[in-house]
Amino acid sequence: FTAMCLDEGVDGIFYAVTTANRGQCSGEEFQRFQRPFDERILDAAARGTTNMLHICGGAIQADWFANYRAHLLSWATTPGNPSLSDMHQKTGKPVVGGIPGKPAFGQMSAAAIESHVAASLGEMNGRAHILGPDCSVNPGVDEELMLAVKRQIHAFRPTKA
């Protein structure tokens, strides 16, 4: 299926892994039962130009993915998970995140979202970062919350290195 998608002209795939959380499986179990299937799909997608790996959940085992064949890495930057800059430093790959995911996004105030987004933009300083939700954003959230994200994007100015 992955190869057929690329044959049809897609630039890449979004691939989510849901079995890499501390306490869910051991490293040995992951290597034996999960990684071979991940590699099969990511190898088929390797000729794509924009493959994103999303590591679902909390307490992720980030080290297990350092050499996965994906161009971009996405995960929830919640307590217990690596920060955007930590993951980028660990893997050298661009990261996707910085907007709270569901259900938190819909439960936050616009000011809290602005603060969170500003902090993530500042953390990465406009480098190796695509601003996106930690997971997804539920449909039907208050438009003011989406506008809070937009305001921070327009207000952001990277510092000179």
Q: Model regions: which residues?
A:
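Active-site loop segments of alpha/beta catalytic cores
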Residues: F1-A161
